[in-house]
Design a protein with these regions (language model features):
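Short beta-strand immediately N-terminal to the catalytic nucleophile in serine-hydrolase-like folds
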Residues: 24-26, 51, 99
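Solvent-exposed alpha-helical segments and adjacent loops
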Residues: 215-439
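Beta-strand-rich binding/interaction modules
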Residues: 189-228
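C-terminal catalytic histidine-bearing segment of alpha/beta-hydrolase fold enzymes
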Residues: 103-198
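Hydrolases whose catalytic domains are alpha/beta-hydrolase-1, hotdog thioesterase
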Residues: 33-37
């Protein structure tokens, strides 16, 4: 999606384009992309037209089929990042028309989205090409084009009077004027519903939400979950947070917290500018040094092969203040080898010396274990620091982008005595998520 938005911005910089008359459409792999962009960024489009593709991982990829290694609990939780079915409610404010060939196996995508939308009380217009496999039926395509042109003529409403939004992560914090600013628990469902009352008042209801941002210039009155909240002088936007069960005006109290742009899991760092930082020193243990060197090269190769770019990389002695300000730092090695990691270690949530790696009270032999971790950078809490991983799917997922979902949560400990394979970088002996305060 980063590529999509950068390409869109480049076109908009050169052409005069009405932002309220942009639609998203695609077929097959482009259909999968459209399901994602429509549900996760619903407030941007005048309409969406996904054709074929896939809309979720489990059923489409048959991950629970006999003989397959079952996904871990954290993998299943992280399907909530990309599954369009988990974000179906957002299509309530994005007119969407699906297309499928009648005999196309990828009709499955529209079928599962129809079911997901029905659970939200919504219906999905679904055009079907009779007797058609994996392509557009010419006459049905003409019908689809006419419908989309009518929706473009109407255009997107930049300030809808009513909004319903849902998310599992603050990576996708809402739409238009109604936005999540804090969640009760990442990867559990959170909902917002809002109704404007004239130009200066709004009613909001929440679920699984601890902070809300209302981008409504001139707003004076807020009723949230039935509670009236007094606002200070009108401003371009208002932030409210819940504390001790009571909604209050203003941002949440200062301190580490998951928020838009800082949510985890480890793959989240690669949706923005990042920098691989390789060690220049000697690892405490040969096994750790060999493993981190191999994993760094694998990460660089994957980035070139799948994402068609060269991952930026610097030595640990060459990182600048500008790098700290602009990039998520991906640190490779152990504190004996990587000087920047050694510098940051006192402010990271683990203890690591030449003998022992300790994380969350569990002590492990540092000769045979290494951490994978994402955490706010102590030198710049607006950015991440990541330890010892690139994009975390491996060879097993290369055959289908439906499998290229996050494989690891916020942190993991790897036993290096099991060599890396097609699914894992070694034996994962523990893995989990930090809470909303990065604890």
């Amino acid at each position: 999606e980063t590529d999509v938005f950068e390409a869109l911005a480049a076109v908009q910089a050169e052409q005069s384009i009405d932002p309220n008359r942009i639609l998203v459409a695609g077929f097959s792999m482009g259909g999968a992309s459209t399901w994602h962009l429509a549900t996760h960024h619903a407030g941007l489009w005048a309409a969406a037209a996904p054709g074929a593709g896939f809309a979720e991982t489990a059923a489409y990829a048959k991950v629970f089929a006999p003989g397959k290694e079952p996904p871990t609990a954290w993998e299943q939780k992280l399907w909530g990042w990309y599954d369009a079915t988990a974000y179906a409610r957002n299509l309530s404010h994005c007119p969407t028309i699906a297309y499928s060939g009648e005999i196309d196996p990828q009709k499955q995508a529209a079928d599962v989205m129809t079911a997901a939308l029905a659970q939200e009380g919504l219906t999905l217009p679904h055009l079907i090409g009779p007797g058609t496999a994996h392509k557009y039926h010419p006459e049905v395509r003409q019908d689809l084009t006419a419908r989309l042109e009518a929706l473009l003529d109407r255009g997107r409403d930049p300030r809808p009077a009513k909004l319903q939004v849902t998310t599992r992560t603050l990576r996708y914090p809402g739409a238009s004027w109604l936005r999540f600013e804090g969640l009760a628990e990442h990867w559990s469902r959170a909902d917002l519903a809002g109704t404007l009352r004239g130009d200066t008042a709004v009613d909001v209801t929440t679920r699984g939400t601890t902070a809300v941002r209302l981008v409504l210039p001139g707003l004076r009155q807020v009723r949230i979950d039935g509670q009236e909240v007094a606002l200070p002088a009108p401003a371009p936007e208002a932030v409210l947070h819940r504390q001790d069960g009571v909604w209050r005006a203003g941002p949440p109290p200062a301190g580490p917290r998951k928020r838009p742009g800082l949510t985890g899991p480890v793959n989240d760092a690669f949706l923005d500018r990042f920098l691989f930082v390789r060690p220049t020193g000697k690892a405490w243990h040969p096994a750790v040094g060999a493993w981190t060197t191999a994993e760094l090269e694998r990460a660089r190769s994957l980035w070139r092969t799948l994402f068609r770019g060269d991952a930026p990389i610097k030595d640990d002695t060459a990182v600048t203040a500008e790098d700290l300000a602009q990039s998520h730092l991906i640190l490779w090695g152990d504190p004996g080898a990587n000087r920047l990691l050694a510098r940051l270690l006192p402010d990271l949530p683990l203890q690591w010396d030449a003998r022992t790696l300790t994380f969350r009270g569990e002590r492990r032999d540092a000769a045979h274990h290494a951490p994978i971790l994402i955490y706010p950078n102590p030198l710049n809490p607006e950015k991440y620091v990541v330890l010892n991983t690139g994009i975390d799917f491996r060879d097993h997922a290369y055959g289908s982008n439906s499998l290229q979902t996050p494989k690891l949560p916020d942190h993991a400990i790897v036993d290096l005595r099991e060599p890396p394979g097609s699914r894992w970088p070694g034996r994962i002996v523990s893995a989990g998520f930090f809470d909303e305060a990065w604890r």
